[in-house]
From Swiss-Prot:
Lineage: superkingdom: Eukaryota
Name listed for the protein in its UniProt record: Pre-mRNA-splicing factor CWC21
Sections of the chain in a coiled coil: 71-118
Composition skew (Basic and acidic residues), residue ranges: 148-196, 229-243, 250-284
GO biological process: mRNA processing; RNA splicing
Gene designation: CWC21
Length: 284
């Protein structure tokens, strides 16, 4: 059923006999030069080259460029051009050493200024430089970074994503709190009303005559010795409208309770009559 720990321990539910027909894992993978049974699993030469180029490009994009190496490469090119000019003038033999050195220095200054201008101008990758960029990953990394900077500027995104994600909501909330007016909540209103500076300025809801009448009643109660609250300017008199509303509410509650008791009495009487009928003998 199984061979070398490979296979099914039981054929039940597998819709097969459970026996291994071939052992593919024991066969060596054929090379690209000698394609055999596994040729359809292999990549062609063109696909292999395309994959290698993609890997090199990704590798160059991930790695950071070394600025010193690029600067050294530019200086080396300048010195190579100067040495070629110096060798050419020395072979001709028409000029002296001072003139040759002066021309070489002039060429060196010109090439240095030219390369400095090329660094300031952002250039894209051309097809002629693709092979050179694939070999020099530092240069490819610099150009890739320039492309990413242009993309970031185009989409107007910040360089520090953590600051953009964490600080922006907090700053927005802080600005909204500063701009929004102070909310007059119920707790703050009650605290201001309880404060001693506002007790004397509490709005008077009722007329003066009603307040005088209530103060007279309170003074009479104090004279009779009945317990009551101290009458002062800060005590609130009861509204006659509130008293009438409470009186009407009490009357309605009494009428409702009276109706409920009447319904309960009628219900009990009906239940008693039904019980009497059930106890009475049948007429036949």
């Amino acid at each position: 059923m199984s061979y070398n720990g490979i296979g099914l321990s039981t054929p039940r539910g597998s819709a097969t006999s459970g026996h291994i027909q071939t052992n593919i894992s024991n066969r060596a993978f054929q090379s690209t030069n000698h394609r055999g049974e596994f040729a359809h699993h292999e990549m062609t030469d063109e696909q292999d080259k395309r994959l290698n180029k993609k890997l090199d490009r990704d590798y160059a994009a991930d790695r950071q460029a070394d600025v010193e190496l690029l600067e050294h490469e530019r200086k080396r090119k300048v010195e190579v051009a100067c040495m070629e000019l110096q060798d050419k003038l020395e072979e001709e033999g028409q000029k002296g050493e001072e003139e040759i050195e002066e021309e070489v220095n002039t060429l060196r200054r010109q090439l240095t200024l030219k390369m400095a201008r090329e660094l300031d101008v952002r250039t894209t990758i051309v097809s002629a430089d693709r092979e050179a960029l694939r070999k020099n990953y530092h240069k490819a990394a610099v150009i890739k970074q320039q492309e990413m900077d242009r993309m970031r500027d185009a989409f107007d995104t910040t360089k520090n994503l953590d600051d953009r994600g964490r600080d922006r909501p907090r700053n927005r909330q802080r600005q909204n709190r500063e701009k929004s007016p102070v909310r007059d909540t119920r707790r703050s209103r009650s605290a201001r009303e309880r404060s001693p500076s506002r007790r004397g300025r509490r709005p008077r809801r009722y007329s003066v005559t009603e307040d005088v009448r209530t103060s007279e009643v309170i003074s009479e109660r104090q004279g009779s010795g009945s317990p009551c609250r101290r009458a002062d300017s800060r005590s609130r008199s009861r509204s006659p409208e509130r008293g009438s509303r409470r009186k009407s509410y009490r009357e309605r509650s009494r009428s409702r309770s009276r109706e409920r008791s009447e319904r309960r009495g009628r219900r009990d009487s009906v239940r008693e009559r039904e019980q009497d009928r059930s106890r009475s003998p049948l007429p036949y």
